[in-house]
C-alpha cells in the first residue's frame, strides 16, 4: 500500500466475502444472488457475522448500488430497506466462534458478512459449506504487513516479510490452518498448484483458466471499506436498530 511515493505496507493475502451457504440445502446456483437470503428454505436460518461493515456492504450491493460504500442518501435508504426486509429471516447474530459452530452444525444454512476465510476452514474439515460470490458482486478484505516505527526487531520483521512474500511463503500462507486466503503472487500460485493442487482448485487459484483474479478484473469485487458519504456511527446505529427490530 503506497501513499504518494512512500510504501507503508506489503499485501500478502486477501479474500472475498459473498453468500456463505450449506451445500446440502442451497446449491451454488441458489447462492448466485443475495436474494437467496429471502428464500423460504432460509427462514429462521440466516446468520449474520456481527459486524456492520461487511454485512451492510453486501446489502448495498444487493440493493443495486454501484458502489457498496460510496452512496448518497437515496442509496443509503435502499440499504436500510433491503436489510430490514430480511429481519424475519434471521436466526441470529454471531461472533467468530458462533459463526463457525452454527454453520458446522447446520443451525444456520446461509450466512451474510463472511467468506472462505471461515467456510474454507469448515469445508476442508468435511463440513458441507461453501462461499459463492453472487452476481451482484462480492467484497474483498486484504491482509498486509508493516514494520512499526521504532521497532526493536527490525531485521526479524524484514526477514518475515521477505519470507511471507516469497513463492514458498505465499503458498504456505494460502493454506494457513487458521484461515485460508487468496495470494497475490503469481509465482506463489505456481508453487501452490505444484504442491497442493486440490487447495489451489478449491480456492479458484488455478492458472490458465478462469480464476479468482478474473473476478477482480471483471469488476465483480469491491473493497470492504468505511462508508464515504455517511458517518461510521450512522451505519453502526442502523445495525443496532436492525438487530433490535
Q: What positions do the PLM features span?
A:
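A bilobed periplasmic-binding-protein/Venus flytrap-type ligand-binding module shared by bacterial periplasmic
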Residues: 18-25, 60-64, 141-156, 172-175
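Periplasmic-binding protein-like
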Residues: 76-86, 125-149
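Extracytoplasmic ligand-binding site segments that recognize negatively charged/polar headgroups
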Residues: 1-107
Amino acid at each position: 500500500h503506497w501513499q504518494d511515493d512512500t510504501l507503508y505496507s506489503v499485501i500478502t493475502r486477501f479474500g472475498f466475502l459473498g453468500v456463505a451457504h450449506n451445500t446440502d440445502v442451497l446449491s451454488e446456483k441458489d447462492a448466485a444472488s443475495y436474494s437467496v437470503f429471502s428464500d423460504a428454505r432460509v427462514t429462521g436460518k440466516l446468520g449474520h457475522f456481527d459486524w456492520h461493515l461487511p454485512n451492510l456492504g453486501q446489502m448495498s450491493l444487493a440493493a443495486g448500488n454501484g458502489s457498496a460504500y460510496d452512496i448518497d442518501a437515496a442509496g443509503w435508504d435502499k440499504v436500510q430497506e433491503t436489510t430490514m426486509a430480511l429481519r424475519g429471516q434471521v436466526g441470529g447474530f454471531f461472533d467468530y466462534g458462533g459463526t463457525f459452530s452454527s454453520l458446522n452444525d447446520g443451525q444456520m444454512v446461509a450466512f451474510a458478512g463472511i467468506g472462505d476465510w471461515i467456510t474454507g476452514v469448515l469445508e476442508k474439515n468435511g463440513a458441507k459449506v461453501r462461499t459463492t460470490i453472487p452476481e451482484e458482486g462480492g467484497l474483498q478484505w486484504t491482509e498486509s504487513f508493516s514494520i512499526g516505527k521504532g521497532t526493536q526487531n527490525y531485521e526479524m520483521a524484514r526477514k518475515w516479510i521477505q519470507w511471507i512474500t516469497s513463492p514458498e511463503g505465499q503458498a504456505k500462507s494460502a493454506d494457513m490452518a487458521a484461515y485460508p486466503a487468496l495470494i497475490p503472487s503469481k509465482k506463489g500460485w505456481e508453487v501452490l498448484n505444484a504442491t497442493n493442487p486440490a487447495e489451489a482448485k478449491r480456492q479458484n487459484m488455478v492458472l490458465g483458466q478462469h480464476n479468482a483474479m478474473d473476478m477482480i478484473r471483471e469488476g465483480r469485487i469491491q473493497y470492504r471499506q468505511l462508508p464515504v458519504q455517511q458517518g461510521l456511527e450512522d451505519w453502526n446505529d442502523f445495525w443496532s436498530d436492525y438487530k433490535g427490530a
